[in-house]
């Protein structure tokens, strides 16, 4: 008899797992509380402006292409992606700008401010991150390893310690090899992919730089939601039954097994396996009602990553100095991280990510206008949440900073504005305290690991998404779905012997 898989949540991790399970011959039902598939890969359109509500950067497209190849299909027949050789532009408070290109040589050619020594150091750092990326790919990505003990067993103690560089934090690894203060800050902010601090995260996450340099940075034509639409189409073609607007209220358990889910309609649906794309702690807390003692232990070890104050602005002018992807850096990177991740306050001088897809895709804003998305990282929801007044003051601080750093009269030109706070993120995606990136990567707290993909309490419950390994970011959550499918397939094959 064909076994039934229930997937809770239609984010990229959930839809990826559903596709692989269906490709492997299982009966798969996916339940998504929202009316779209993709989770945080969401879309907002108004007054002629189009915005990616969630992630705006696509990296490692081969992870997505594999899903189509398993079905003997080509991703290019479903969605169009475009490589961006000019990866992003960094603005600094003193007026310095640095353009990051795909390739160290190209970066040197486009930045007269960078010396020969700067480029040599950048190449040396790339070589260092390549070594980490290669060893990470072998075990962490290809085999879905989940813990430090699994890493050590797979690679050997000395090999793991040296090549994963567990001795240093990410920022220590950068500062050891890079002397240019602008490059130090720019490279440190690659940690944005996982919503953490480069001063706390382990050096293994330096591999994010090599990953982007080697695999490229891509734009999904028309908006990144088209990638989610492509995966939804593939899932339906493979026989996945997708229910949108369908909320799972709880997971039924018996001893150490999960038996099915209860929907908000009252209907009970049985399952042989459950894969939750809802974050781990909210799953245990709200769907299973795990006891307080065990929940508290998990919350101490796996603290939420950062959230964000997200502004979608329709602007009645153009700023020629902007690239597609832009970063407006803080005067004091350490203080910014300290305020967000330790003091848990809205930062005085935030680093701001600004994406302007209209620079590449002119369909995203009316002629002569621009669609600007602004994202500074801020703390997840605290026991005493920020107030409406706090957010209003922070909004002014953001606009003041952007105007001071070159976006002249930005306030005057805003003709459309939509804002998401951590509370909106929590409400729409049931994320843990409004975190965007799942679990924080912290060398001391969790050695940079997120939750394992297999439940430690229920033998047929699995997790995918940003709160589990291999981590946040759209390629990683998609890979987590494929890794969970591999684990279930291996388990079933073993049971049949």
Swiss-Prot record:
The record lists the catalysed reaction(s) as: all-trans-4,4'-diaponeurosporene + 2 AH2 + 2 O2 = 4,4'-diaponeurosporenal + 2 A + 3 H2O
- Which BP terms in the Gene Ontology apply to this protein? carotenoid biosynthetic process
Ordered alphabetically, the record's keywords are: Carotenoid biosynthesis, FAD, Flavoprotein, Oxidoreductase, Virulence
Top-rank taxon of the source lineage equals Bacteria
Is tRNA processing given among the entry's keywords?
no
The yes or no answer to whether the keyword Flavoprotein is present is: yes
Q: Where does FAD bind?
A: 7-19
Enzyme Commission no: 1.14.99.-
Q: Where are the membrane-spanning stretches? A: none
Q: Which GO terms describe its molecular function?
A: oxidoreductase activity
Q: Which Pfam families match?
A: Amino_oxidase
Name the cofactor(s).
Answer: FAD
Pathway involvement of the protein, from the record = Carotenoid biosynthesis; staphyloxanthin biosynthesis; staphyloxanthin from farnesyl diphosphate: step 3/5
Q: Which family does it belong to?
A: Belongs to the carotenoid/retinoid oxidoreductase family. CrtP subfamily.
Q: What does this protein do?
A: Involved in the biosynthesis of the yellow-orange carotenoid staphyloxanthin, which plays a role in the virulence via its protective function against oxidative stress. Catalyzes the oxidation of the terminal methyl side group of 4,4'-diaponeurosporene to form 4,4'-diaponeurosporen-4-al.
Q: Which NCBIfam families match?
A: crtI_fam (TIGR02734)
Protein name per UniProt: 4,4'-diaponeurosporene oxygenase
- Taxonomy-wise, where does this protein's organism fall, top ranks first? Bacteria, Bacillati, Bacillota, Bacilli, Bacillales
Q: Gene name, please?
A: crtP
């Amino acid at each position: 008899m064909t076994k039934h898989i229930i997937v809770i949540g239609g984010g990229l991790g959930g839809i990826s797992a559903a596709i692989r399970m269906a490709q492997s011959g299982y009966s798969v039902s996916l339940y998504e509380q929202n009316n779209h598939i993709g989770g945080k890969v969401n879309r907002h359109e108004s007054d002629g402006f189009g915005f990616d509500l969630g992630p705006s950067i696509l990296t490692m497209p081969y992870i997505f292409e594999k899903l189509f190849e398993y079905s003997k299909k080509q991703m290019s027949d479903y969605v169009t992606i475009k490589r961006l050789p000019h990866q992003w532009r960094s603005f600094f408070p003193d007026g310095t700008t640095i353009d990051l290109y795909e390739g160290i040589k190209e970066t040197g050619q486009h930045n007269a401010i960078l010396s020969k020594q700067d480029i040599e150091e950048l190449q040396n750092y790339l070589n260092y991150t390549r070594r980490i990326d290669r060893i990470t790919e072998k075990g962490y990505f290809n085999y879905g390893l989940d813990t430090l003990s699994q890493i050590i067993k797979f690679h050997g103690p000395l090999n793991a310690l040296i090549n994963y560089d567990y001795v240093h934090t990410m920022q220590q690894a950068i500062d050891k090899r890079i002397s240019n203060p602008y490059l130090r800050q720019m490279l440190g902010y690659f940690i944005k992919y996982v919503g953490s601090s480069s001063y706390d995260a382990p050096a293994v996450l330096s591999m994010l730089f090599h990953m982007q340099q080697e695999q490229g940075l891509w734009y999904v034509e028309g908006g990144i939601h088209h990638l989610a639409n492509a995966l939804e189409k593939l899932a339906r073609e493979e026989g996945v039954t997708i229910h949108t607007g369908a909320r799972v209220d709880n997971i039924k358990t018996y001893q150490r097994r999960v038996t099915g889910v209860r929907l908000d309609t009252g209907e009970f649906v049985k399952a042989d396996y459950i894969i939750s794309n809802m974050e781990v702690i909210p799953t245990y807390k709200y769907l299973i009602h795990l006891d307080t003692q065990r929940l508290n232990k998990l919350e101490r070890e796996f603290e939420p990553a950062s959230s964000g104050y997200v502004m979608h602005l329709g602007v009645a002018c153009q700023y020629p100095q902007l690239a597609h992807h832009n970063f407006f850096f803080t005067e004091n990177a350490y203080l910014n991280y300290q305020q967000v991740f330790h003091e848990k306050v809205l930062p005085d001088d935030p680093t701001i990510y600004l994406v302007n897809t209209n620079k590449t895709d002119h369909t995203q804003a009316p002629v002569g206008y621009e669609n600007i998305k602004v994202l500074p990282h801020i703390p997840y929801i605290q026991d005493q949440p920020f107030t409406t007044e706090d957010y209003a003051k922070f909004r002014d601080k953001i606009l003041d900073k952007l105007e001071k750093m070159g976006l002249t009269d930005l306030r005057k030109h805003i003709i459309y504005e939509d804002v998401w706070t951590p509370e909106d993120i929590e409400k729409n995606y049931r994320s843990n305290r409004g975190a965007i990136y799942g679990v924080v990567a912290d060398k001391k707290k969790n050695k940079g690991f997120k939750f394992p993909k297999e439940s430690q309490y229920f033998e047929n419950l699995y997790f995918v998404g940003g709160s589990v390994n291999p981590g946040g970011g759209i390629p990683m959550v998609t890979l987590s779905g494929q890794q969970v499918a591999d684990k279930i397939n291996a388990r079933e094959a073993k049971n049949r012997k």
